[in-house]
């Protein structure tokens, strides 16, 4: 009985298995016939192309699983349907990304140094940092890429340096402009549930580069819009620029992680104040300062003039125009006002275009060598004149040093006194709140130490003080004019001359202590352009001077101070101006009962 029961069970199970197989076969045949009727028989050509391409990819196992799962979905769609197109775009994006595909680095340090020096003049700190990275990569063999931020005034070569670094290392180069970026999805991409969804610009740039370790320039990172209704793009960049997180960057469109840890990110910025602090902390900051006139002349000779001669076609017959040094210097000082060389390049191009017009019309160049007198024929009258020291003939006029996002410049602080019972302080010159506060602090210090100047205190009760900073259309702010304002007030009160060819920069406190300020190199360049020979600054700024190459310091003597009295001891001479103002003090009348 047991044997018969066993046979019956086996027979039943076998029949069920056969029925199931027949059912599956029947269903598969039906699906096949339906696909053939719809024109999608043995899989679409796109399906087979993707399947073939996938065999050569070196992607992670998790990514492969997602890809093949999505590929199976593609097979189910009609090629004429919108879903097929959406799915195909997604799969093509995945297949075109360079998963674990890297270009081989050329780690020849001597060659890299030559490439960087050939393409860019100066920039020693940046070049040194790139060579350090290459050296460690050469010794260790594997290294997370640094996140570098180059900041400085416009036109100094921050963006173009990225191409040179890529050429030096033989890596792919890609650039992404962040100026005006206001939507987080531009970085992270859109989810595929949205119509017209696509990956973010980071993933698209990597796809364009065709390598997982390109040199990636994030241009104008300080111009990213913050806290918008479409999400905060600067917050999305935190994941991209964090070495601890970017090995698994998550794009909303891909919905899988992509490794960005081998990408050499180089951000550029003009002003660090507009970059959010968390983003700033993730980057290694390297300052790219402006150029002095001698450096600009060298850059013009080596790069700008040869490039523009080629661009204007003036080298076709081998008869090239030449600029002498004095002509280049005149263009720099009277036709441009910048720390970089962008405007210089435009002026050189403008001059050569004029020559190209003459040559095309007359058949020959009017002159082979361009001199200072001929620059006006080509460029017109100079729009600028050198910021020059204006002498010390007037009391109350002191030269200060300022720093803006486009470089350094000199400014003049003027103080005058006028008869008035209120003893009022007036500030003009489009000054910001911080600079106004500096003026108030400077005046209060002078009042507290009026005896050291030998002036009657009652002058503040009977004379008004007016402080003005020329070029009123230009906004001015910051605390660094503190010692300049204090010296200007002291000079106006005593009618003593200020030492010749002297400028100063430094913040002051109510106690008269001088505090360090920033932008020292840019301020030194501005002082040199103006013919200043002596600069007064805080003693704590000496460390900044020690880091500046000697070529920038040539011809300038520095005087380090700790308090305002030190400033006055050096800056105020014993000589009275030619036509001093006589401050009369009226005695108070007492009525007797």
Regions found by a protein language model. Give the residues of each.
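AAA+/P-loop NTPase substrate/partner-engagement loops
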Residues: 168-197, 205, 225, 295
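Conserved C-terminal "switch" segment of AAA+ ATPases
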Residues: 57-65, 100-102, 210, 271-349, ...
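AAA+/SF3 P-loop NTPase mechanochemical coupling elements
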Residues: 209-214, 249-268, 322, 463
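Conserved catalytic/switch belt of AAA+ P-loop NTPases
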Residues: 220-258
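Extended, charged alpha-helical coiled-coil/arm scaffolds that mediate oligomerization and mechanical coupling
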Residues: 1-140
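Conserved C-terminal helix/linker of AAA+ ATPases
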Residues: 43-51, 87-88, 104-110, 317-325, ...
